[in-house]
């Protein structure tokens, strides 16, 4: 029986490449001249740490990072934007955790969408991925198209199509 897996993963090397391009853009932009701006990636904890002088620059930097991630093929939903910035002396800091894996609520939402579609497929939750099996590949492709059109709150990738 054909099947595929639904996951939410961010390739750390691709993320690092996107951040390197963002750093290079910030150093060449006129409005960031002589600014003490830093973008660091903690690969173990999967957190992007941004430090700059004021909140206006912080918003611009976050926009640059999201744009560069999109150009590298990383969905903006992979970043947890809920953490607000905080001040540390004259600097403003912000941590952007990178989401890896699908949480329980999103799994339930995805499975409900699949079951409500009426297709003859079976979703099964396995840790941080969802395996969808069906009798026809066409049914699986319909589910992929359906999930791409819906907003489930996480960046989804479809892998292991067999």
Swiss-Prot record:
Gene3D superfamilies: 3.30.70.860, YajQ-like, domain 2. Keywords: Nucleotide-binding. HAMAP family: YajQ. Belongs to the YajQ family. GO terms for cellular component: cytosol. Pfam families: DUF520. The keyword Nucleotide-binding applies. The lineage of its organism: Bacteria, Pseudomonadati, Bacteroidota, Cytophagia, Cytophagales. This is Nucleotide-binding protein CHU_2278.
């Amino acid at each position: 029986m054909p099947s595929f897996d639904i996951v939410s993963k961010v390739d750390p090397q691709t993320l690092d490449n996107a951040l390197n391009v963002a750093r290079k853009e910030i150093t060449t932009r006129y409005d960031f001249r002589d600014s003490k701006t830093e973008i660091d990636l903690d690969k173990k904890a999967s957190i992007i740490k941004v430090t700059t002088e004021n909140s206006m620059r912080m918003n611009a930097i976050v926009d640059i990072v999201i744009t560069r991630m999109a150009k590298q093929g990383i969905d903006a939903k992979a970043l947890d934007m809920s953490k607000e910035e905080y001040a540390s002396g004259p600097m403003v800091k912000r941590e952007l955790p990178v989401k890896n894996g699908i949480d329980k609520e999103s799994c339930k939402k995805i499975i409900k969408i699949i079951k409500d579609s009426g297709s003859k497929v079976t979703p099964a939750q396995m840790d941080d991925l969802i395996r969808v099996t069906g009798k026809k590949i066409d049914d699986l492709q319909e589910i992929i198209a359906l999930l791409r059109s819906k907003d489930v709150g996480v960046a989804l990738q479809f892998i292991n199509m067999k």
